[in-house]
Structure formats: C-alpha cells, structure tokens
UniProtKB/Swiss-Prot annotation:
Involved in starvation response and aggregation stage of the life cycle. May be involved in fruiting body morphogenesis and spore formation. Induction: By starvation. Rapidly and transiently expressed in the first 5 minutes following the removal of nutrients. Expression declines after 30 minutes and is undetectable 2 hr after nutrient removal. It is found in: Cell membrane. GO terms for cellular component: plasma membrane. The chain crosses the membrane at residues 15-32. It is a single-pass membrane protein. It comes from Dictyostelium discoideum. This is Starvation responsive small protein A.
C-alpha cells in the first residue's frame, strides 16, 4: 500500500512537499524564536518580515527620494571604515623589516 502511494507521487508533488516542509520549518523557527524572546531566555533580534523592508523603501520614495539617492546613502554609511594610506603601510613595513634584521643579527 505504501509502495502504491510512493509510485503515485509525481516529481512535481515531491517539489511541493519539500517546499511546504521548508516553509513550515521556517515558520516553526520564527514562532520558537518569538516565544523564547517573550520568555526572556534568548536575547535575539526580533523577526522583521520582508514586508517591512518594502514599506520602508516605499515611504522613502513617497518622501521624494529616488532609488539612486537611497543607494548612495547606504554606500556613504558603509564607507566610514578607517583606511590606512599606502605611505603608512610602507613605513610600517620598513620599521618591521628593521626590527627583524636587528633581531636576526643578535
């Protein structure tokens, strides 16, 4: 009887079953995470749905910002990392090389 059930399932059915399983597992994970956060046992970031992302972008577009302005602002925020100049790297390299040569002579 079980063999007949497996034979009657088509590849499309397998794909649907796998997708349904993945989606339900994701939903269980989100519910579990929210319950743990409510209990205070886990201090994780609360789940934010994908709809929130689009609402935020839509609100920015309504305010008069176009998509290129939004992307430029994101890039500016990411560029705040401190960079070391090439000359500073050369100085550090020369100093380390001198120290190594002094240690090697001793």
């Amino acid at each position: 009887m079980i063999a007949k059930v497996f034979k009657s399932i088509t590849p499309e059915s397998y794909i649907l079953l796998v997708n349904a399983g993945l989606i339900s597992a994701y939903g269980v994970r989100i519910i579990f995470q929210s319950v743990k956060n409510d209990e205070g046992k886990v201090d994780e970031k609360a789940h934010i749905g994908i709809g929130h992302f689009f609402k935020k972008r839509g609100a920015q577009l309504v305010d008069g910002k176009n998509l290129t302005d939004i992307l430029k602002e994101k890039k500016k925020k990411k560029k705040k990392k401190k960079k070391i100049n090439i000359s500073n790297k050369l100085i550090i390299f020369k100093i380390s090389r001198q120290l190594y040569s002094k240690l090697k002579l001793k």
